[in-house]
């Protein structure tokens, strides 16, 4: 995904060449796949999810997300379950049908979400937020999707990865000072980087 280019580049790794460029439009954030021929990507500036058909190499849908500002992280739950998108600017998690784009749920979460992780063994979605919380969302029952736990982490920790076997989450963290320029982002202080390990 080309973040500011508004398109997706398809690369043949064996031939080491670009085989297609797929127009999507907008500022592209995190993509995910359903494993069955569709790729989905958050379009930050349009507050929508775009769907790409891998076989035809075309964008086939644009699904707007009402009341979602700056969608970044995105996870696709395999099977009949949904897409989960984190709206980082206004503290919302949007849950959409991966087939139709219809909204299934809209959940309040902490501000500054980025990554969205799916833990298949525990059937939960995990969203680390810059405000210092890890949101745990149960999707075991499609009719009752909800935030079931808010785990305190560290302010600024919003990107993480998951060990699918143990369920442990590894989140990047640091101490922050004031922005370098007024209105800018807080600056990480040298020598304060660490990895938070969160057990299920």
Language-model-detected regions and their locations in the chain:
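Predominantly soluble domains enriched in secretory-pathway, periplasmic, or organellar proteins
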Residues: 1-200
């Amino acid at each position: 995904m080309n973040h500011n280019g508004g398109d997706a580049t398809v690369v043949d790794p064996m031939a080491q060449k670009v085989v297609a460029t797929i127009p999507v439009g907008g500022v592209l954030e995190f993509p995910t796949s359903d494993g069955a021929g569709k790729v989905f990507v958050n379009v930050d500036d349009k507050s929508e999810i775009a769907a790409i058909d891998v076989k035809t190499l075309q964008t086939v849908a644009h699904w707007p997300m009402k009341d979602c500002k700056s969608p970044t992280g995105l996870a696709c739950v395999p099977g009949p379950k949904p897409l989960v998108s984190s709206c980082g600017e206004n503290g919302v998690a949007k849950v959409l049908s991966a087939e139709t784009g219809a909204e299934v749920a809209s959940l309040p979460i902490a501000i500054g979400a980025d990554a969205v992780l799916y833990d298949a063994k525990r059937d939960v979605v995990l969203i680390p937020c810059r405000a210092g919380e890890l949101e745990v969302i149960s999707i075991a029952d499609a009719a009752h999707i909800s935030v079931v736990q808010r785990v305190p982490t560290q302010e600024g920790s919003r990107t993480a990865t998951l060990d699918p076997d143990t369920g442990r989450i590894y989140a990047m963290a640091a101490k922050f000072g004031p922005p370098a320029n007024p209105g800018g982002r807080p600056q990480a202080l040298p020598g304060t980087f660490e990895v938070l390990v969160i057990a299920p």
